[in-house]
Amino acid sequence: KESALVTAGWSAEARKDAFERTMKSGLPTARDEYWKYTSPKSLTSKKVEKAPLSQEKDGAMFTGANPIKIVFVDGKFAPKKSADFEVSGLSVERLSIINKLDLHWAKDVYGKYEKLSQESVTRPLASYNTAYADEGVVIHVSERIERPINIIYEHSDEYSDVILRHIIKIDDNAELTLLENGPAAARLNQVMEVKLSDGAKFNHIRVLGRDHERRTATHIFGELGGEAKFKSFTLTVNGVLTRNECFLNINGDDAAAHISGACIGDGDFHHDDTVFITHDAVGSESRQVFKKVLRNGATGVFQGKILVKPNAQKTDGYQISQSLLLDEDSQFLAKPELEIYADDVACSHGSTSGAIDE
């Protein structure tokens, strides 16, 4: 409801705009072309399906990397479980705290790339997140950070329904590695917006799943400046429904975006990777590489698009999606697309699926 929106502070204008866009579009349904292969019903229904509490020790997954730990439990920041740190060139704040301020640098990022993504296709879950998200991390990086940040998710409520929003700004020639893992909620709607300035580097690794019962929709939106490098890899193991969306704008010459993922699905597992990369600069590069192993009736989906604008000469864009089907009941659905308006490019896509040779 509109009365639940934040009506003061630096994010209020973006939230109101997102609310109005969501009301105009409505929540997604199975009739929408963009949701042709994945029913959004369990992500939009008022009822949250039960997800038994995890017994896995996900918090120890990346211990060997000596990360800076930030922990969320049921979508709320857990200070006693999180690290207390001071690192030169790194600022980490909570959205719920800075939201009360009148001015903040995050105003120039919050909702900007989410709204831009809506020009190509309507994404109501993302605009809903912009309107209502009240927690997440806001990260500003001005140097090369040696230690990775590890966001660890836990849930203590079998019916937890969580909305999270992360905002990341990386300055010229600075670098950050971000790790994500753990069961965030029975149902999760998460958005991450990333702004990479010239020469900035962002390395992102996340691990989702290991439990069948969770329902997750994640979105990554971002912009790349000149010679910026954006790398994101997601490993997904099970989950009733996982929808990972990524929309990136390459606006700087010689920048590169590599988006990849792997998943192992069993039974009623349904996993959807949907990626849209826009090239709007000279000499830019993109890679979309996704591989899935499916059995016992599991379903995998890949929707990928590369858009090359007229000025984006010498673009190098590549897509590949592959699946291994371990039985006749499993299925892989793919929709790779190229839309090219420049004449000096090297772009290709491919998709294959099959069984193990006997």
Task: List the model feature ranges, each with a label.
Residues 1-130, 289-295:
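N-terminal amphipathic, basic helical "cap/leader" segment at the start of enzyme domains
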Residues 98, 108-358:
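Conserved beta-strand/loop scaffold segments within soluble protein domains that form the structured core
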